Amino acid sequence: MTTKKLYFLSISIIIIVAISIAIYITLNSNTKTRLTNDSQQQIDTIIEHDLQKGHIPGASILIVKNGKVFLNKGYGYQDVDKKVKASPTTKYEIASNTKAFTGLAILKLAQEGRLNLNDAVSKHVPHFKMNYNGQNETITIKQLLAQTSGIPSDITSEDSVTSKNNRLNDVTRAIMGDELHHKPGEEFEYSNMNYDLLGLIIQNVTKQSYTKYITNSWLKPLHMTHTSFKQTNYKSKHDAIGYELQGSTPVVSKPEFNLWDTPSAYMMTSTEDLEHWIKFQLNPPDKYKSLVQQSHKNLSSTIGEPNANAYASGWFTNNDEHLVFHSGTLDNFSSFILLNPKQNYGIVVLANLNSEYVPKLVEHLNTQIVNHKRYSTVASMLNQYKDQFNIVTVLMTTLILLAFIFSAYRAWQMRHGQILLRRSKRIAVLSWLSLCICIALALILYALPYLILGSNNWSFVLTWLPIEIKLALITTLIALFSTLIVILLFLHTKITKT
């Protein structure tokens, strides 16, 4: 009898472990798929879930992979009051994602020999000077690019910088002689003023306004014909209305802004135009390849910045995951652009509300699209295995029924005095071992989203998981604990001899 019990216990554990491993392997199958209509529906569910959670009125989403547009779509409203729906042509203020254009422009001027990255800022902006510990310090163009100039992040909130200082020259004069937080080149500190100064350098070197140079040198050649720079709070036909939350209700917001912040924060564009920018970043023409690659190279480490190892020329970088990205936030807009040049895909999310759910949405889309280097979308891949998951569901349901029948029969036997309870140290040890194994397997099931997808939990996964997979997982979990009950009953009961 003891041998049979041990055999039964071993077989039960092996079956449960095998099923769990099978599910894990199936989820991790090395399958590559492109976004289908079905997978786009799954992505729609994810996007709508996050937009609803963040109370975001409207957003436009772009996904480009291998040079092809997989998704370019608007969600919600660009204007809630007028019921104007968001679309790929809706223009948003992209905030700090403007910096990548400024950074690339500086690198191009350096490539052309019109400036040197090691030039002192004062060479191109003669009136500019700042101090550290009371002594005048030299700041280089490269240090502005790398955000290591030592210029305080909050320098433009000082009283000396007012709405009257609305030109780049004026604002740099207003801060002239101010104290740096750090000695130039020693420490990363993110400051819009670094890129505003780069914009002024572009103006002085090219003898054109910053906006004119960027438009003629980059936007027009890239066919970004509807991209512009914010000049007023007036909104045209395709411009999204910006909102701020009051409680959980978005209300129209038109905050004051400064034109001198244009090189770091005030480009206005759409996902339709950014499609060209993303394709250019991922697959640049030969004459620009080295320039784009240089713009993605680390210039400074960014200790303390979430998900980033370093800062490049207007981009944060994550070397571990080969990501190049930047967020953008204003009082009433937010944006996020993520690139993976190695795997050749990019994600853009533009929204007309400043919301923490914009970077979360990008993370969720990134998880779906690449899923750690294997396939384009998790949901699309899973749908290919519906039949296998249905088989798992049938097997688990059968196991549950058998466990129920066995338990019911054992209960009937106990009621009629046909079995006795058994107690021994060996049985206690086996019982605890079975319990521990079942708990461990349950924890593995609980941790599957993190183990497979990187950083998601079940509450998120269940919003898009196909019903076949949900049933397979639920029945597996129930079967796991049903098997535990059967094992415990088998170990702790003994049929009386008649």
UniProtKB/Swiss-Prot annotation:
Instruction: Supply the SUPFAM superfamilies for this chain.
Output: beta-lactamase/transpeptidase-like
Question: Could you tell me the superkingdom of the organism this chain comes from?
Answer: Bacteria
Q: Does the keyword Membrane apply?
A: yes
Keywords annotated in UniProt: Cell membrane, Membrane, Transmembrane, Transmembrane helix
Instruction: Indicate whether Repressor appears among the record's keywords.
Output: no
In which compartments does the protein localize? Cell membrane
Q: Where does the sequence pass through the membrane?
A: 6-26, 389-409, 433-453, 471-491
* Note, other: Has two of three conserved motifs typically found in penicillin-binding proteins (PBPs) and beta-lactamases, but no penicillin-binding activity has been detected.
Descriptive protein name? Protein flp
Q: What is the lineage of its organism?
A: Bacteria, Bacillati, Bacillota, Bacilli, Bacillales
